[in-house]
Amino acid sequence: MNIRILGLAVILAVNSFAAMAQNSDVAKKEAIAVKEIVESRNFKINILNVLREKRVYMDIYSKNTIEIADGKLIAKFPYFYRNDNPSNTAQSYLKIDSDIRTMKIKNKAKRGMYDVSIKIDKPSKYVVNIDIGYDGNCMVYVTNSQKKTVIYGGRLIEPNM
């Protein structure tokens, strides 16, 4: 009886190690793909949720994207501070279609993410910072001149999607 239990434990341990190795291989491949996309400086982020200053968290599952391509930032940020009590989301959008003045990318390996800092030409009153995890999850921080920040959560996607 003890031999059967020991045999079962060995089989479970071997299967567990194989599954963990397979998961780490998938994570490594995903991290390499994210690195290539970020370093190309051409990528899109699909916005999935928003967290405003009052810590109101909303899942929006929008079709809105933040696109960085060819030295431009094109974005439509829902639920921004243009109207705090909109009757519909279109009343509170912030649209940006501007050339990028500066774009800095830092690899923060200890945190498992890239930090992308963007300053745009017009409107110059906004600063956009993006944290892109090695797994493709993103946090986008948009700050206006009154220091109000809206945080968007999303997912990195390839630019041609």
In which residue ranges do the predicted regions lie?
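Mature extracytoplasmic domains of secretory-pathway proteins
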Residues: 66-112
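A generic structural signal for short, non-catalytic loop/turn and secondary-structure boundary residues
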Residues: 7, 14, 38-40, 133
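Helix-rich interaction surfaces within compact, conserved domain-sized segments
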Residues: 102-161
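Residues that act as N-cap/strand-start positions at coil-to-secondary-structure junctions
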Residues: 30, 58-60, 99, 112, ...
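Bacterial Sec-dependent N-terminal signal peptides
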Residues: 1-28
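Short, low-complexity, polar/charged sequence segments that are solvent-exposed and flexible
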Residues: 62-68, 93-95, 134-139, 159-161
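N-terminal secretory signal peptides
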Residues: 23-86
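A short linear-motif detector with a strong N-terminal bias
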Residues: 22-25, 44-46, 52-55, 81-83, ...
